[in-house]
Amino acid sequence: MLKSAITGWGKCTPDNIMTNDDLSKFVDTSDEWIQQRTGVKERRFSHVNTSDMAEIAGKHAIACAGLNPEDIDVVILATCTPDSIVPSAAAHVQKKIGAVNASVYDVNAACAGFLYALEQGKAFVESSLYKRALVIGAEHITWLLDWSDRNTAVLFGDGAGAVVIEESKNESDGEIYSFSNGLSSDNLEILEIPNFGSAMDRFNPDEAARVRWTFDGQEIFKSGVRAMAQASAEAIEKSGLSKEDIDIFIPHQANIRIVEALEKKLGLPNATTIKKVHRYGNTSAASIPTAFVD
């Protein structure tokens, strides 16, 4: 049976840095308030579209793998902030990087999106359906923010990260072992953008012009830590490894309280936990690949 490996990686973090002090000039907040609750010190704001950031990250990943864009067989872009609904953001990326031989599509699973896309890329390569997959997580999430809501406005940032997946030739290739993805649909309402999509009231100008967030921070903390700890433990078990074997742990960079609670609950005695939320904020589907590249 074929095994897959990550052979290239790249990222795009916008140059426009927005510090907490910068943000407090137009949001009812302060540096102290933000850091105490989220651990975020700064985040990146993009002046270009999601596909533009994905293009840069993707090109870096392809070059890192020693490939050309024409070598890519499938582009999977994880995002909840696509440039457009039709065509997909992945279609824009295909055109911009010149991956003329690739099938392309978007995956929308919000913060978990990159892991879903990575699992699909692994399955494609290991089934021999495709030889080389470019998997990208990219978000222009600041475009969606409600600046009157400091609970969400202070937390998020923009960015993109990408990896190339190919057949693993040997154990030193960075083989992809196992996944544990899933969803509990019992509490969908704790984090929603309910009026963005076909549920939007297009005939109410005030409603249609505003992107509203439903954000229950306490429930997100409790369910997020519990679910990520369970999924991480299951993935380790599926791989045949033990918790003691793990050297580096790269969780979703939700906020520092969630990351540190997850680190404690999971209990990886020999692992270094990568923490980048202070630099980039929560970049949703881009958080894991950008932290991986950093």
Segments and roles (model prediction):
Residues 57-73, 230-247:
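Phosphate/pyrophosphate-binding loops at sites that engage ATP/ADP/AMP, CoA/4′-phosphopantetheine
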